[in-house]
């Protein structure tokens, strides 16, 4: 995904306010051997890009003054109540150095999972993204969580996922975190329990 930016020479609160008033968003690109560089981007283009899932978890081609650099979106600041992007941070990436990125999880076959279709359970997403370590070339846009065989009262863990080649999960101490589960809604009972129940004779 290509992102066009321009070098920014003037800094400070007043300069940033003037930029925003002219339809631009201030930002920075840092990392690697090069010095941090102040940049500005078209606000509307950035606003629409931020709505795309891939913009948050893909290697971007960031073009500044005609020169393209590989980068990741690292942070962005929104106005507390206006639809306005106040600032954005990008980090340079090297093809030979591993990166740590949160990758979105895509839950597949939720409606046809036995625990949902037959057991009348609901799927709860315990995690919606997974932090991974990999080389930039191996970074996936998303990771699939296949629920095709998931039963009622089953919990899907990290060990149940098939991670792409070259991709390692970062779990921060929990070696096999829960990803999703299928349970009955509150107050409901399983079909087996309903069929097995017997009426109590009147006294």
UniProtKB/Swiss-Prot annotation:
| Keywords, comma-separated and alphabetical | Ribonucleoprotein, Ribosomal protein, RNA-binding, rRNA-binding
Query: GO CC annotations?
Result: cytosolic large ribosomal subunit
Tell me the superkingdom of the source. Answer: Bacteria
A Gene Ontology biological process in which this protein takes part is: translation
Which family, according to the similarity comment?
Answer: Belongs to the bacterial ribosomal protein bL25 family. CTC subfamily.
This chain's function reads:
This is one of the proteins that binds to the 5S RNA in the ribosome where it forms part of the central protuberance.
Quaternary assembly: Part of the 50S ribosomal subunit; part of the 5S rRNA/L5/L18/L25 subcomplex. Contacts the 5S rRNA. Binds to the 5S rRNA independently of L5 and L18.
> What is the official name of this protein in its record?
Large ribosomal subunit protein bL25
